Amino acid sequence: EKLNEEKLPGCYLHRTAVNDVARVEDRTFICCERKEDAGPTNNWMAPAEMYAKLRKLYAGSMRGRTMYVIPYSMGVVGSPFAKYGIELTDSIYVVLNMAIMTRAGQKVVPYLDEQFIKGLHARANLDPEGRDIVQFPEDNVIMSINSGYGGNVLQGKKCFALRIATCLGRDEGWMAEHMLILGIQNPQGEIRYVTAAFPSACGKTNLAMLIPPEGYQKNGWKCWCVGDDIACIRVGEDGRLWAV
């Protein structure tokens, strides 16, 4: 819904369904051949069984709607640390937010190879009983349906950068962690970066978005957010930890 052009130029209102306002842990699955590989705290279903279930849910779910194709990069495009994906969706809300939260667009296409993450999302009819958020780490596939909530459908975030990336990191020798990254500069110009892990709803974003009090700013202190939720951490050639 377009808002008043004079008061809020270029702004639109997107209304969230009242039954679709949070991530759904009980409907979030890791589907791999061996149940033990999904981890002790995750929901599991055999891939063949889940694919069969999802095919029925997706059948006709985008009929009459526009399908958008979003090529995106988690990290600087062209960086050796970047990971790439494509999300197909029928939601303009997803398109606009993926453009904010990832590096998306034509510039990503030349970097897509056989390792890119394949994602499919459909709002369908927002039926909670058919709402599934599914990761297939052995296939590099993400599928989510019957939701329009960001945590369930912006697949570059929790689905890719945390769940799928945990498996990629295990195989490639790095870590995907539920952590913020904060940059701090003192009055002498020395810069330090901090990563911090808090449970959900305990202040990761608040700390990551920290603005120094006015008195500290006048004395030359600066803070900036590198990331407020997920950190991909590697050991550099210098033996130190580096995070994006």
What is each stretch, according to the model?
Residues L207:
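Hydrophobic positions on the alpha1 helix immediately C-terminal to the Walker A/P-loop
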Residues E1-C202, P212-R234, G239-V244:
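Conserved internal helical-beta-strand scaffold that buttresses enzyme catalytic cores
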